[in-house]
Curated annotation (Swiss-Prot):
Alphabetical list of PROSITE patterns matching this protein: RIBOSOMAL_L24 (PS01108)
Xref: Pfam families: ribosomal_L24
InterPro entries: Rib_uL2_dom2 (IPR014722), Ribosomal_uL24 (IPR003256), Ribosomal_uL24_CS (IPR005825), Ribosomal_uL24_KOW (IPR041988), Translation_prot_SH3-like_sf (IPR008991)
NCBIfam families according to UniProt: rplX_bact
Record bears the keyword Ribonucleoprotein: yes
Quaternary structure annotation from Swiss-Prot or TrEMBL: Part of the 50S ribosomal subunit.
GO molecular function, one term: structural constituent of ribosome
Keywords, in A-Z order: Ribonucleoprotein, Ribosomal protein, RNA-binding, rRNA-binding
Protein name: Large ribosomal subunit protein uL24
Entries under HAMAP family matching the protein: Ribosomal_uL24_B (MF_01326_B)
Organism lineage string: Bacteria, Pseudomonadati, Pseudomonadota, Betaproteobacteria, Burkholderiales
Amino acid sequence: MNKIRKGDDIIVLTGRDKGKRGKIALRKDDSYVLVEGINVVKKHTKPNPLKGTVGGIVEKSMPIHQSNVAIFNVATGKADRVGIKLAADGKRVRVYKSSGEEIKVA
C-alpha cells in the first residue's frame, strides 16, 4: 500500500519550491510523483510541421521524489507522516501519525 496516492494534498519539504502545496496528479514509477504547479520548468521546443506543433517555450511540471514531499494535514495546517492501521472491518487504512485520524481523499 502506497502511503502517498494520486489526489492527496501535499506540501514540498525541500528544494526551490519548499513550502508550496499542491495535489498529486500522477505517481511515476515507484518513487516519483507529479504535482500540479510544482517543479515547473521551461522547455524549449522546435516547431514540427509533421506533428502540427508550434515551436516556442512551454512550461511543464516535472516529477519530484516522494521523499521531498509530505502529506498535508488540513486539521493541523502542517505536514504530517502517514501510518497504516487495520480498520474494524479488517481493511488497511491510512492514518495521520500525529492525530490518528483516517486520511480521506477528496
